[in-house]
């Protein structure tokens, strides 16, 4: 309930003097995620790179090539479009990690073919992106996919019209406990095999 000067908060308090300000838990969760991402260098750089890949693949010529590669490599599966990132809607980050993970092989192939077949700025951009997409990138992609999937589930529940303050507080508390368990567990070891398999399937740099 924002707008303490002239918005909804002020008008409600004129009618109900004991009403108190409650920040939207869904928005509050987004603010925390945004702050963390901006203040952790690895996270900030990772999501910046993910956005650069999205922008690159959105070019009309490149986009058509990306779709063609998907049809060839995954003929029986649905085409996946990469997701634009947003500071205010972190479900976009979760979706972006999900789709990038599913189509990582296609993305790497797209960058390789563009850097080899194109000329000028587009080829240079492809080589620049490809040089940054290494085993660490894959590890972070898998890590954020796992973490953001948990957070996104809670974010969606917070948007439920029937949710009240008590339910919101309980959801956030459970999420904090879940993330603490992840931090204290061997999460990296648990999915290291998946990361290793991805790295084996993808040769990042041109020989």
Tell where the protein language model's regions lie, with residue ranges:
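Alpha-helical structural modules in large enzymes and assemblies
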Residues: 1-207
């Amino acid at each position: 309930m924002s707008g303490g000067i002239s918005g909804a908060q002020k008008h409600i308090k004129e009618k109900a003097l004991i009403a108190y300000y409650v920040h939207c838990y869904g928005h509050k969760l987004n603010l925390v995620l945004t702050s963390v991402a901006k203040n952790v260098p690895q996270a900030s750089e990772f999501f910046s790179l993910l956005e650069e890949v999205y922008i690159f693949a959105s070019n009309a010529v490149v986009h058509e090539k990306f779709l063609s590669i998907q049809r060839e490599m995954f003929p029986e599966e649905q085409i996946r479009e990469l997701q634009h990132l947003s500071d205010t809607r972190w479900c976009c980050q979760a979706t972006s990690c999900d789709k990038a993970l599913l189509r990582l092989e296609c993305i790497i192939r797209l960058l390789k073919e563009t850097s080899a077949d194109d000329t000028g700025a587009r080829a240079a951009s492809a080589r620049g992106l490809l040089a940054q997409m290494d085993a660490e990138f894959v590890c972070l992609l898998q890590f954020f996919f796992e973490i953001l999937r948990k957070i996104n589930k809670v974010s969606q529940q917070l948007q439920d019209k029937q949710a009240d303050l008590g339910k919101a507080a309980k959801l956030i508390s459970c999420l904090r406990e879940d993330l603490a368990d992840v931090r204290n567990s061997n999460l990296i070891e648990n999915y290291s095999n998946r990361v290793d398999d991805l790295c084996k399937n993808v040769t990042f740099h041109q020989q």
